[in-house]
Amino acid sequence: MLSFLSSNISNARQTLAQVLNFALVLSSAFMMWKGLSVFTGSSSPIVVVLSGSMEPAFQRGDLLFLENRRPRAEIGEIVVYNVRGKDIPIVHRVVRTYPEIEGKTKQVKEISDASSTPSNMLLTKGDNNVADDTELYARGQDYLHREEDIVGSVRGYIPMVGYVTIMLSEHPWLKSVLLGIMGVMVMLQRE
């Protein structure tokens, strides 16, 4: 009876240790992500290229590293932005800043937000696209606001690493297989 009780306590300790180790890994990853977000000034410091609109500069599946500390984006700079109301990051190049956009002066003067200065308004386009991105922007939006819409500017990349993310989103059954394999590995790893 005593050996049975002792083995149950030992199993409970092992299970608790595994749960705590798993929680430690998750919390460490979360802290690293948040630390990277603070360091780069971007809410999403790492993104994956989801389409071929920026070829040949970036291919689908490239992993991009972002930084969002500069107050202005320059023409030719590659930025990542979110369309208002949608949570899909778009990677495109800045083709115009406000002073170069003609006929928009009236709209700029009507903006009540004092932080929206001409240098904060951008027009973007994918390198592999024929037209600019005005069709992609939210309804009634003719340009991007640097502070509101831009997630960050590209500062580096690793080719093809993001394909794992693309595969998992395009084939949902792969998530189940991956979780199953990880679960089996955790069960077999008991010491």
From Swiss-Prot:
Domain of life, per lineage: Eukaryota
Topology, Cytoplasmic side: 1-14
Pfam annotation, one family: Peptidase_S24
GO biological process terms on file: protein targeting to ER; signal peptide processing
A GO molecular-function descriptor: serine-type endopeptidase activity
Annotated InterPro entries: LexA/Signal_pep-like_sf, Pept_S26A_signal_pept_1_Ser-AS, Peptidase_S24_S26A/B/C, Peptidase_S26, Peptidase_S26B
Bilayer-crossing regions: 15-33
Known catalytic reactions: Cleavage of hydrophobic, N-terminal signal or leader sequences from secreted and periplasmic proteins
Catalytic-site annotation from UniProt: 53, 92, 133
EC top class, as a word: hydrolase
Membrane topology label: Single-pass type II membrane protein
Keyword Hydrolase listed: yes
Family statement drawn from the similarity comment of this UniProt entry: Belongs to the peptidase S26B family.
Physiological role: Catalytic component of the signal peptidase complex (SPC) which catalyzes the cleavage of N-terminal signal sequences from nascent proteins as they are translocated into the lumen of the endoplasmic reticulum. Specifically cleaves N-terminal signal peptides that contain a hydrophobic alpha-helix (h-region) shorter than 18-20 amino acids.
Name the record gives this protein: Signal peptidase complex catalytic subunit sec11
Upper taxonomic lineage: Eukaryota, Fungi, Dikarya, Ascomycota, Pezizomycotina
Gene (UniProt): sec11
